[in-house]
Design a protein with these regions (language model features):
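Signature for phosphate-centric chemistry
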Residues: 1-54, 58-231, 235-248
Length: 248
């Protein structure tokens, strides 16, 4: 069984993440620097001269640091840029809108399907045979084996965001079938969470109506002003799917 070796690695991950949950990883910082580099090189006319760059972030430190890495990179290419940055609750109504009605719809719809979906897609027995010498005992004594499987899969996926663990592969603890099924389950969860579906009365895309309106308003202003400029927003991946659905 490979459980002891896996546990040793996970203890290293736990130590590295101590009081750092939700922060920007080292690879994440580099990714934002590279994104900013590609933006500057692919659209030099936008960032020419003393162009105004308005950068907004949510109030989460990971997003603030993402913004800092991006704008510092842009400033390095063109010191003349007039960059303003902000991260305030004032902007959260469009940067990361919290819709209580959507929350209720999502929770209610998912709970009616949760057990059936987990039983269909999450089968931890094979994983437990890989990890434990006595897999039957483990299945009987590990609380919520399906949650254990999901949590382990999430940690393994996040390890590739850190240089310390980028060459450590624990995906091979899972069979190809396990990986496929967890991926399918997560896709279904995202469908409940953010998709345009009758199960949630097609409300989820409209959570991002304020953000889309902000896109349109700032774009209109830029066109009317007739000057090269950029508006950058640093938020959360959970916004992307409902926004894409809303934009059609």
């Amino acid at each position: 069984a490979r459980g002891k070796a896996a546990l040793a690695t996970l203890k290293e991950v736990d130590a590295a993440s101590y009081k750092r949950l939700g922060e920007l990883s080292d690879i994440g910082a580099e990714q934002h620097q590279r994104i900013a580099t590609r933006m500057y090189k692919n659209y030099p006319e936008v960032f020419a001269g003393d162009a105004a760059v308005d950068a907004r972030s949510t109030v989460v430190i990971r997003c603030i640091l993402s913004m800092q890495n991006a704008v510092t990179t842009l400033k390095g290419f063109n010191p003349q840029l007039r960059i303003t940055t902000d991260a305030s609750e004032h902007d959260m109504y469009f940067m990361n809108y919290d819709d209580p009605v959507a929350k209720r719809l999502r929770s209610t719809a998912y709970k009616t399907q949760e057990k059936a979906l987990k039983d269909k897609y999450l089968q931890p027995k094979r994983l437990f045979r890989t990890l434990f010498t006595d897999s039957k005992w483990a299945m009987a004594n590990v609380k919520k084996p399906q949650k254990f499987m999901l949590d382990l899969f999430d940690v393994v996926g996040n390890m590739q965001s850190h240089h310390q663990f980028e060459n450590v592969d624990l995906y091979n603890l899972f069979s190809e079938e396990d990986r496929l099924k967890v991926w399918e389950y997560n896709n279904i969860r995202w469908y409940f969470w953010a998709g345009s579906t009758p199960l949630t009365k097609n409300r989820m895309p409209y959570m991002e109506a304020n953000l889309l309106r902000n896109f349109i308003t700032t774009a209109d202003k830029a066109i009317l002003d007739g000057k090269n400029c950029a508006t950058l927003r640093f938020g959360h991946e959970s916004v992307v799917l409902p926004l894409v659905c809303l934009m059609g």
